Amino acid sequence: MSVVPVADVLQGRVAVDSEVTVRGWVRTRRDSKAGISFLAVYDGSCFDPVQAVINNSLPNYNEDVLRLTTGCSVIVTGKVVASPGQGQQFEIQASKVEVAGWVEDPDTYPMAAKRHSIEYLREVAHLRPRTNLIGAVARVRHTLAQALHRFFNEQGFFWVSTPLITASDTEGAGEMFRVSTLDLENLPRNDQGKVDFDKDFFGKESFLTVSGQLNGETYACALSKIYTFGPTFRAENSNTSRHLAEFWMLEPEVAFANLNDIAGLAEAMLKYVFKAVLEERADDMKFFAERVDKDAVSRLERFIEADFAQVDYTDAVTILENCGRKFENPVYWGVDLSSEHERYLAEEHFKAPVVVKNYPKDIKAFYMRLNEDGKTVAAMDVLAPGIGEIIGGSQREERLDVLDVRMLEMGLNKEDYWWYRDLRRYGTVPHSGFGLGFERLIAYVTGVQNVRDVIPFPRTPRNASF
């Protein structure tokens, strides 16, 4: 007799007539007049629970089994048999049921009802992984993360752990969380009356990172191909379905690569991970297609088969200006394309994923390589049907003199980036990379509309509970 995951029983990895033990939580219990109870027991290893058939001849049947309610934790031992009922191939004929933990008051158990609103589940984020929806999201999140690591490992990339605490603003937007141990009730001041960060823990003003890119570039310029994957932070006061204050970013960086190289890398990566999730999480994806977004599976299948379209930003603006559609946000050369513009291009004009390249320099970051025209930079966005931008990237500016001018134009102090500038002084090379917001990827895959529901504990303006 061995302890096995529920997934092994349901997916036929345990021989019929084997004695096994499963451990998990009760989803439902129903009793028949014939003195038999049916427990649906789940352990999170797969979408479906396993049915345990319990005869009233068990010594603790009346005392324990008939008191079991949703959420109680149990250890069930018995024989794996072919299930005569519909819905699953195998079930367990229980010979022993142990109760590991009771639900104190079943009537007030927050997960007692069968269906809950997504808004309610955010209020009980510590219990919501027990629901079908959030459990499925968690497994898909895991599978996507593993597939990303696998893809980059197979491509010869090294994973680099970049710091979460930094003194540099990658985006130059200033929307950063400050990290400080100073006493807010008694702040030290310098001669100008400003806060004296010399007295702070790090001896200078420090922040939570908005991106691992700048640090990643240093390792790409030594190891050739690297990627970072970890949490990032933005102090944007944005209460939208697409924004979080804390989220995960995947950022590959490749030496000797140009914009077209990383556009190809982005396409290969997305198709790889979409194929992986369809193959490895078929039961969860079936649930999303049935209960969340009927297009969840077919959308990924179409994406995998599609040839990516490519268009210059200037041509994209012309397409939008001449399409006959009245957009909420006006279209003109120099505007940062909004979600409605991106989705029109991907869903209606090209009817495929689109790589938009060569954006105006004034709407992009200082580190993006200036093109020959002096007006645009070698930047790209990957637009996906159904969501719009899913990846943003660029060829990095490897010319020190041009980089310095760009920093000056954007009001950045180049001395703050002395180490980043050193990369251009000592064996500079063309190099490129992109960023993928992991939660937006999960939302795209699952069809879940709000990124707050694809991360375990969302951090948003005025909310850092749990």
From Swiss-Prot:
Q: Name one GO biological process term.
A: asparaginyl-tRNA aminoacylation
Q: Which CDD domains match?
A: AsxRS_core (cd00776), EcAsnRS_like_N (cd04318)
Q: Which InterPro entries match?
A: Aa-tRNA-synt_II, aa-tRNA-synth_II, aa-tRNA-synth_II/BPL/LPL, Asn-tRNA-ligase, Asp/Asn-tRNA-synth_IIb, NA-bd_OB-fold, NA-bd_OB_tRNA
Keyword Cytoplasm assigned to the entry: answer is yes
- Family matches, as Pfam families: tRNA-synt_2, tRNA_anti-codon
Enumerate the transmembrane spans: none
Per the UniProt entry, the Enzyme Commission number(s) are 6.1.1.22
Compartment annotation:
Cytoplasm
- Domain of life here? Bacteria
User: GO CC terms on record?
Assistant: cytoplasm
What is an example of a GO molecular function annotated in this UniProt entry?
Answer: asparagine-tRNA ligase activity
Tell me what reaction this enzyme catalyses: tRNA(Asn) + L-asparagine + ATP = L-asparaginyl-tRNA(Asn) + AMP + diphosphate + H(+)
Recorded family membership: Belongs to the class-II aminoacyl-tRNA synthetase family.
Q: Which PANTHER family does the record match to this protein?
A: ASPARAGINE--TRNA LIGASE, MITOCHONDRIAL-RELATED (PTHR22594:SF34), ASPARTYL/LYSYL-TRNA SYNTHETASE (PTHR22594)
Instruction: Cite the record's note on assembly.
Output: Homodimer.
Name of the protein in question: Asparagine--tRNA ligase
Its source organism is Shigella dysenteriae serotype 1 (strain Sd197)
